[in-house]
C-alpha cells in the first residue's frame, strides 16, 4: 500500500551509523524520494535542522510526517516547527516498526548497498557528504522493484500533476486543528475522555 499523492505522508527515522554518527532518513510514501543526512547526535536541534533539509529537497509540500516514538520527534520545538510549516505529526503505535516499513526498508538498503562499502573506522571521512551523494544516486539512478523498475524521480514525474499547492495544504492543516503531542499523549487523551464523563 502506498499513498497516491507526493508529500501526503513522509516517513522519518534515525539509525546509528557509528559512534557519533546518526543517519536521519525521510522517505516519501508515494514516490520513495528520500532525504538523508548524518548528524553527530539525535537531539532536537538535529531533528529540526533535518526537517529544513527535507523541505529544501522535496519538490512538493509535505502534508504529514510519520515517525516512531523516539524522543527526537516528541520534543515541543520539533512539533512547533512542523506547525510552522503546516505539517501534521503522525506517530505510529508503540512497538510497531512495520508501520514505518518504507523508511525501515530503505535504511536496510543503505546498510547493505552503501555503508557496508565504507570504512567507518576512518574518522577523516565526511559521512554527510557521502550520504548526500548516495541520496542523489538513490533518487535518480537506482531502480526500485516497488516502483516497477522506476527511480523515485521517474515516479515523481509520473504523478507530478497530483501535487497540491501549498495554500491548499495549509488550509487543510488549519481545518484539522492539530495539537502538539507530548510523548505520553495517549494517557492525556484517556484523562480528557475520563473527565468528560
Residue ranges of model-derived segments:
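Short small-residue beta-strand/loop micro-motif enriched in glycine and branched aliphatics
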Residues: 33-37, 91-92, 116-117
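Mobile-element integrase/transposase regions
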Residues: 1-27, 33, 46-49, 175-192
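RNase H-like two-metal-ion nuclease catalytic core shared by retroviral integrases
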Residues: 67-69, 75-82, 89-113, 125-128, ...
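Basic, flexible linker segments flanking DNA-binding modules
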Residues: 1-9, 96-97, 151-160
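Short, surface-exposed connector motifs at secondary-structure boundaries
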Residues: 31-33, 59-64
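Short catalytic-loop micro-motif centered on adjacent basic/acidic residues
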Residues: 37, 63-68
Amino acid at each position: 500500500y502506498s499513498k497516491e499523492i507526493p508529500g501526503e505522508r513522509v516517513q522519518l527515522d534515525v539509525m546509528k551509523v557509528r559512534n557519533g554518527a546518526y543517519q536521519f532518513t525521510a522517505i516519501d510514501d508515494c514516490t520513495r524520494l528520500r532525504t538523508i543526512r548524518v548528524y553527530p547526535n539525535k537531539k532536537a536541534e538535529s531533528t529540526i535542522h533535518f526537517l529544513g533539509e527535507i523541505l529544501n529537497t522535496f519538490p512538493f509540500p509535505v502534508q504529514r510526517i510519520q515517525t516512531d516514538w523516539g524522543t527526537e520527534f516528541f520534543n515541543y520545538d520539533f512539533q512547533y516547527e512542523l506547525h510552522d510549516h503546516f505539517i501534521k505529526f503522525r506517530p505510529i503505535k508503540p512497538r510497531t516498526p512495520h508501520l514505518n516499513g518504507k523508511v525501515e526498508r530503505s535504511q536496510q538498503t543503505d546498510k547493505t548497498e552503501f555503508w557496508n562499502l565504507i570504512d567507518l573506522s576512518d574518522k577523516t571521512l565526511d559521512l554527510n557528504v557521502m550520504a548526500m551523494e548516495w541520496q542523489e544516486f538513490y533518487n535518480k539512478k537506482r531502480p526500485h522493484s516497488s516502483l516497477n523498475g522506476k527511480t523515485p524521480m521517474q515516479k515523481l514525474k509520473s504523478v507530478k500533476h497530483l501535487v497540491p499547492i501549498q495554500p491548499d495544504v495549509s488550509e487543510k492543516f488549519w481545518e484539522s486543528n492539530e495539537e502538539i503531542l507530548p510523548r505520553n499523549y495517549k494517557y492525556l487523551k484517556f484523562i480528557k475522555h475520563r473527565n468528560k464523563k
